[in-house]
């Protein structure tokens, strides 16, 4: 069973929920379901650990961060396998990109924490204004389901490196790698209570965490609606919010089309398209639109959809049935709105092995001749669906591409 990680040890809960493999639909195991009680324990541990950790020399914190980064690097195969099992992300992406990036996050912020320089400003002959950076205190870190381990380290590394303590709340949809981070942190020498991890649902564990009066700052990655609710709930705390997106890609006629095609395919179809930075709207100058569209659709059709654990797979499974229904719902909307379907669509990918029969697989889907005011161009889909939009040079302007 996946438990909480509080004050340097595993902690159980009275309630549990079941975690599933999105590629097969099979149960992975039970997960502790935390609430206000577990959050209170975790915040208390973080609060108790804060004074000593905040006063630990930056050079010592940096050394511990580098050690944790090295331990993650040593465990890349194991962590990548867990991440793929949990999320449906292709193993070649978790093994070669996401977990190594998690290691790099700790190395990067190990350097940052020893170089936090303030500034001074002479006001007159008798007065000097200066800035001094100090740790905030207990931070609530809320990580999403799509790239859970990498995003968790993206939050944890700067938080801990700069002298804060943390309570990390993972998504209930992808909890497997969380306690691995807790165990590796202890192995690296990070004191108990500095990093605490609570599993559970957003409505219970997440809500209790952001409301807790001893939490001084909140870092949240997830949906825009949830981010707004957190700010309404938590009041005057410090925030770092990474919310929804509908990122544009611009293709001009003088672009290197080979490089542009590779980059555009990567931005939308890597990580199964389940990324807030997905390049889901591609604006293409009219003079090169036919050529770009033809080749882009052909390359999308050649992408390999299949078992996330197979190194050849390029697009894996959606995280849940509910999310699959959302993404396919937008494909239906695109068809109803009159966009031209050039690749993918609603048909299940062909030739999937029998053990993936219950998986949530969607073909890379390409809509061409999209009007930027269509819903598929205005609303975040969070899946392998892209809009190709022809546009004249005079309309390739910021007001056009950011009109969402």
Task: Show where each model-derived region lies.
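N-terminal alpha-helical segment of soluble enzymes
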Residues: 22-87, 287
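Residue-level signal for inorganic ion chemistry
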Residues: 25, 61, 83, 163, ...
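Rossmann-like NAD(P) dinucleotide-binding subdomain of oxidoreductase/dehydrogenase enzymes
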Residues: 117-259
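ALDH superfamily catalytic-core signature
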Residues: 217, 225-371, 390-396
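Single conserved hydrophobic/aromatic residue that forms the stacking wall/gate
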Residues: 395-404
